[in-house]
Amino acid sequence: MQVQNIEGSLNASGLKFALVVSRFNDFIGQKLVEGAIDCIVRHGGSADEITVIRCPGAFELPSVTRKAMLSGKYDAIVTLGVIIRGSTPHFDVIAAEATKGIAQVGMEAAIPVSFGVLTTENLEQAIERAGTKAGNKGFDAALAAIEMANLYKQL
């Protein structure tokens, strides 16, 4: 008897993606979008198969992601956004609810939903994670979405 191994490939060819991105802190969010698009194209995907959907803020990401998932148009969804800690508890509430909501949509979805929302202590950390010192987390989230979309197709 042989053990069967199933895993996804990193080939984005023929896959359709929705990038759901919050506009708040857009100068950083746009860098995440650029990283995600770069990843998909580098892995054989086509820019014509990518739809960028913008919503006001991170709190709206789960509902917009759910709507995109229910449309049946996409093989995977990449959520992107930036939540930076301020001097009030607002950060904790928004970060927790956005994360929980996106995770819930991911559990309901028949397609993969990857998480590329930055939750940082300050602006410098956000900039570092959007394409400078710490890589681009949009790229990383898209890479996970590619692998998961191919994995889902095998299950």
Curated annotation (Swiss-Prot):
Any one of the GO CC terms: cytosol
PANTHER family: 6,7-DIMETHYL-8-RIBITYLLUMAZINE SYNTHASE, 6,7-DIMETHYL-8-RIBITYLLUMAZINE SYNTHASE DMRL SYNTHASE LUMAZINE SYNTHASE
Residue positions binding (2S)-2-hydroxy-3-oxobutyl phosphate: 87-88, 129
Gene: ribH
GO biological process terms, semicolon-separated: riboflavin biosynthetic process
Keywords associated with the record: Riboflavin biosynthesis, Transferase
Residues that bind 5-amino-6-(D-ribitylamino)uracil: 24, 58-60, 82-84, 115
Active site per the UniProt annotation: 90 (proton donor)
Task of the protein: Catalyzes the formation of 6,7-dimethyl-8-ribityllumazine by condensation of 5-amino-6-(D-ribitylamino)uracil with 3,4-dihydroxy-2-butanone 4-phosphate. This is the penultimate step in the biosynthesis of riboflavin.
Pathway: Cofactor biosynthesis; riboflavin biosynthesis; riboflavin from 2-hydroxy-3-oxobutyl phosphate and 5-amino-6-(D-ribitylamino)uracil: step 1/2
Protein name: 6,7-dimethyl-8-ribityllumazine synthase
Entry EC no(s): 2.5.1.78
